[in-house]
Amino acid sequence: ILELREITGWRVPIYVKIGGARPYFDTTLAVKAGADVVVLDGMQGGTAATQDVFIEHVGQPILACIREAVRALQDLDMHREVQLIVSGGVRNGADVAKCMALGADATSIGTAALIALGDNDPRWEAEYQKLGTTAGAYDDWHEGKDPAGITTQDPELMKRFDPIEGGRRLNNYLKVM
């Protein structure tokens, strides 16, 4: 973290992302190392960029993690000094309210935002099936073959994504969240 501070001239906050396996100890380590923000990711996150055993069986649900991370921050007298942002399975307003009530400073969404933008759109069903999945079940965004054109660098696939429509859909999702 010190090296990052030197590179950035101490002008930007340093975020450290930790998984939900050992929230108390990993939060403590991040704070003692000098993090400005701890991003705690629970096991229900939609990552597809790892082996199935990690996706399904490693970590704890985000709500179980928050209490331990907050306790670590309180034990260090850093609660509300070092921000705690939580993610991983946050899908609706009730999830956000629970996270905030447990002591998080903010929440973030990932997969929910992709779906709101139009990923997993049924109109690309045939192409999802070619990838061995179906619309609504696609989660291999890291492969860069997203038929909806959202999580890809393929110029032809990217043409499918309408940023105006995607923005409208995401805006609607966030309003009702």
Tell me what each language-model feature is:
Residues 2-158:
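Glycine-rich phosphate/ribose-binding loops and adjacent secondary-structure elements
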Residues 158-177:
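C-terminal extensions of enzymes
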